[in-house]
Amino acid sequence: MENKYKLWVARDKNGFLFAYEDKPKRCDNKKEWFAEKFLFSIENSFFPNLKWEDEPLEVMLTQVIKS
């Protein structure tokens, strides 16, 4: 059985990586991304090619339940 969840990943100006439920919008003044729902922070070494200057990345998180 698999469950899939769509989320958005974005890196802030300081290099920190975050996941959002909706596509976030860039806030240049604060050098961060903002969305209705912030989900969680992500290990900074993940998505090494994703930079502050890039648009958020849409990803699918798949939960795999082993029997």
Language-model-detected regions and their locations in the chain:
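Low-complexity intrinsically disordered segments
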Residues: 28-67
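A short beta-strand micro-motif
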Residues: 6-12
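Short, surface-exposed terminal/edge motifs of secreted or surface/virion proteins that either
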Residues: 16-28
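N-terminal helix-cap/turn-to-beta initiation motif at the start of protein domains
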Residues: 1-5
